[in-house]
A protein has these predicted regions:
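Non-heme Fe(II)-dependent double-stranded beta-helix
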Residues: 4-10, 14-65, 71-182
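Short, charged/polar surface micro-motifs in flexible loops or helix N-caps
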Residues: 175-178, 202-205, 218
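Short, conserved beta-strand element in jelly-roll/cupin
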Residues: 189-205
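A generic local secondary-structure boundary/capping motif
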Residues: 183-188
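Hydrophobic side chains in beta-strands
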Residues: 171, 198-199, 212
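Double-stranded beta-helix
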Residues: 50, 205-224
Length: 224
């Protein structure tokens, strides 16, 4: 009602309203969410051609079209930084679910990840995670979380001044399993948002999510 009456920009600029109705979006249909999203995009999408940096322009336009874009070369994470991150998380305790809140809330050491054989749909099913504090205590990740180049892409795509609000680090072992988080699904946290995924190791069908649905950010139904 509020967005229909006053517009998305009014809602987005009002922190009180956003806090009050943060979870309300989960009760809305995809069709209604996409309608609000597309109306917002159409107010500034023509300005994409005015983006002064060619690489930023390419990335934003590709994300608008496909819903995702490989920005490996744009962000330029160094090999030694990748190794540092991997070694860091091997030394930290983790939870036995793809998200700490989707676990039994008990921390364990990295060395124990192959010891759990529960038949629970989510817990001990090959997926593990670290809390946000653990992730942000790593210098490489903290610098990426507040990275100006990533923020610029987010601002240009969303059409307003964005702020990072969540960080999730997930680990999964090589195991032929079916897990709810790797089945095709859509997480809609806001009407307009941008997410950045970093794969610190190689992935395949038994080790990490590897497929994105082209157009699933703007269409309710997409082809397989």
């Amino acid at each position: 009602f509020i967005i229909n009456k006053f517009g998305y920009k009014f809602f987005n600029n009002n922190k009180v309203l956003r806090l009050l109705f943060f979870t309300s979006i989960r009760g809305m249909s995809l069709n209604k969410i996409f309608k609000i999203r597309n109306i917002h995009f159409n107010t500034f999408i023509k300005k994409d051609d005015e983006i002064y940096d060619d690489e930023k322009k390419r990335i934003v336009k590709e994300v608008r079209k496909k819903g995702y874009c490989d920005i490996t070369n744009y962000i330029g994470i160094k090999k030694e930084e990748i190794n540092e991150v991997k070694n860091y998380f091997k030394s930290q305790q983790l939870y036995n679910g793809h998200d700490p809140l989707q676990s039994d809330l008990k921390k364990s050491d990295y060395s124990e990840i192959y010891n759990n054989n529960s038949n629970h749909e989510i817990f001990n099913n090959g997926y593990f995670s670290y809390d946000a504090e653990t992730s942000l205590n790593n210098t490489v990740l903290k610098n990426l979380f507040y990275n100006k180049k990533l923020k610029q892409i987010s601002d240009l795509y969303c059409g307003f001044n964005t702020e990072p609000y969540n960080i999730c680090t997930m680990l999964n072992i090589k195991k032929e399993i079916k897990h709810p988080v790797t089945e095709y699904h859509r997480d809609i946290d806001d009407f307009v948002s941008a997410g950045f995924f970093i794969f610190w190791t190689k992935t395949d069908k038994n080790n990490g999510a590897t497929t994105y649905k082209v157009g699933s950010h703007i269409k309710e139904n997409v082809e397989n």
